[in-house]
């Protein structure tokens, strides 16, 4: 999985050099943000059921037509699959926060997602709406500290932009 640390080391190694001062400063900044990322991961992990339910509900509220015959949420089984997918992405957000890099999202969530959604006639806009809702719903300090919120929103923004 890619993280700031592995990316820095890989770049230095590929160039046949030691990490530069700016490389090390980047790693140091990443380490200093680790506590906030871990707080965000812990909060998401302990509240994931509510987060997923609210995100899915917001998705179906915004895109009510998805429950029409022939659409992605035409029956309870398909609706449950949508919630399952949102939960999967939230788990990947959690992993991304823990490792401090986008590797989990890149490797297990984003690669090919748009093509899969297109092939299965699943609207990626609905998933994006769920993640935008989650990001915009965040309340500091009720949900987590300000820095943890920044880290959480950064991971969500990465996912939103990747699926857009």
Curated annotation (Swiss-Prot):
Topology within the bilayer: Peripheral membrane protein
Organism domain of life: Eukaryota
SUPFAM superfamilies xref list: Globin-like
Biological process, per Gene Ontology: photosynthesis
The keyword Oxidoreductase belongs to this UniProt entry's keyword annotation: no
Subcellular location: Plastid, Chloroplast thylakoid membrane
Post-translational modification remark: Contains two covalently linked bilin chromophores.
Binding of (2R,3E)-phycoerythrobilin 1, residues: 82
Primary residence: plastid
A single GO cellular-component term on record: phycobilisome
Record flagged with keyword Plastid: yes
Keywords assigned by UniProt, alphabetized: Antenna complex, Bile pigment, Chloroplast, Chromophore, Electron transport, Membrane, Photosynthesis, Phycobilisome, Plastid, Thylakoid, Transport
Pfam families: Phycobilisome
UniProt feature coiled coil, ranges: none
Positions contributing to (2R,3E)-phycoerythrobilin 2 binding: 139
Alphabetical list of InterPro entries matching this protein: Globin-like_sf (IPR009050), Phycobilisome_asu/bsu (IPR012128), Phycobilisome_asu/bsu_sf (IPR038719)
Subunit and partners: Heterodimer of an alpha and a beta chain.
Family statement: Belongs to the phycobiliprotein family.
Main function: Light-harvesting photosynthetic bile pigment-protein from the phycobiliprotein complex.
UniProt protein name: R-phycoerythrin alpha chain
Source species of the chain: Lophosiphonia boldii (Red alga)
């Amino acid at each position: 999985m890619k993280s700031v640390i592995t990316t820095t080391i890989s770049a230095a190694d590929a160039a046949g050099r030691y990490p530069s001062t700016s490389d090390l400063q980047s790693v140091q900044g990443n380490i200093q943000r680790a506590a906030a990322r871990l707080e965000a991961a812990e909060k998401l992990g302990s509240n994931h059921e509510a987060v997923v339910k609210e995100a899915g509900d917001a998705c179906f509220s915004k895109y009510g037509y998805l429950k029409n015959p022939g659409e992605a949420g035409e029956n309870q089984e398909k609706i449950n699959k949508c919630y399952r997918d949102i939960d999967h992405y939230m788990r990947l957000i959690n992993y991304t926060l823990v490792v401090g890099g986008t590797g989990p999202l890149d490797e297990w969530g984003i690669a090919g997602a748009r093509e899969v959604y297109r092939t299965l006639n699943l609207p990626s806009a609905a998933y994006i709406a769920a993640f935008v809702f989650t990001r915009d719903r965040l309340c500091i300090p009720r949900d987590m500290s300000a820095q943890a919120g920044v880290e959480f929103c950064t991971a969500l923004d990465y996912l939103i932009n990747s699926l857009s």
